[in-house]
């Protein structure tokens, strides 16, 4: 089940999706590049458990964190928090440029799905890289505001329980976290979903993956269908 989407007023959001010919920091063949920012944001919202990456003394440092994607004032903002014991918040405060990686379903693709024997295995997946500047905060009012975003997104039913907790307990718990907000300056979206294969081969892949009991694998088939791949999508397009 996808987390509930929360929307905010603020007018049209600036398109920060990296387009053809622009500088990029991840290898994306043109077959697999997305130039649809709306679809990219939807993918991020459906897969909000991201990897936050920044540097300390030229060494990479990563944390695995759920985040909320917010569109406000024409900008995309990513909000979340880390444990105060996690030094990552200090690294963000010292050097604000950072990267958040959103990864969705993925699956091994057997060459048995293809129409000729001269083929090799590959892997299908979707991923989005979000680059931006981070700001950290630990003031109670702003932490509460951040949780007002997180709780409705991931478990709206918990809001009442959270509000009913003893205030001293809530304050003590908030003292163990540091919040962050990242204003996104650039998005790079890669959906490697057999776009370089024939429609029939795409359909073979979809049907093969759909038979799996592993939701990560079958989810890859669903992602391919969302991107209008396969013979069924082609037929639907012709019928419209």
Residue locations for each model-derived region?
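Cationic, low-complexity basic patches in intrinsically disordered or flexible, solvent-exposed regions
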Residues: 3
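Binding-site signature for planar aromatic cofactors or substrates
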Residues: 11-240
């Amino acid at each position: 089940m996808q987390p509930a989407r929360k929307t905010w007023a603020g007018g049209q959001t600036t398109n920060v999706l990296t387009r053809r010919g622009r500088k990029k920091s991840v290898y994306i063949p043109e077959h697999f590049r997305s130039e649809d920012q709306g679809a990219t944001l939807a993918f991020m919202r459906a897969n909000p458990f991201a990897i936050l990456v920044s540097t300390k003394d030229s060494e990479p440092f990563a944390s695995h964190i759920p985040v909320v994607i917010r569109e406000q004032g024409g900008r995309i903002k990513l909000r979340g928090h880390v444990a105060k014991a996690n030094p990552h918040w200090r690294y963000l405060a010292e050097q604000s440029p950072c990267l958040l990686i959103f990864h969705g379903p993925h699956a091994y693709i057997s060459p048995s799905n293809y129409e000729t024997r001269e083929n090799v295995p590959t892997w299908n997946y979707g991923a989005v890289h979000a680059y931006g500047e981070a700001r950290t905060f630990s003031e109670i009012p702003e932490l509460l505001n951040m949780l007002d975003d997180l709780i409705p997104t991931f478990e709206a039913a918990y809001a009442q329980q959270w509000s009913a907790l003893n205030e001293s307990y809530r304050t003590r718990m908030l003292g163990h976290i540091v919040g962050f907000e990242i204003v996104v300056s650039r998005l790079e979206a890669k959906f490697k979903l057999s776009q370089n294969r024939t429609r029939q081969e795409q359909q073979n892949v979809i049907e093969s993956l759909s038979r799996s009991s592993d939701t990560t694998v079958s989810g890859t088939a669903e992602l391919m269908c969302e991107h209008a791949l396969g013979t069924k999508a082609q037929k639907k397009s012709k019928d419209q």
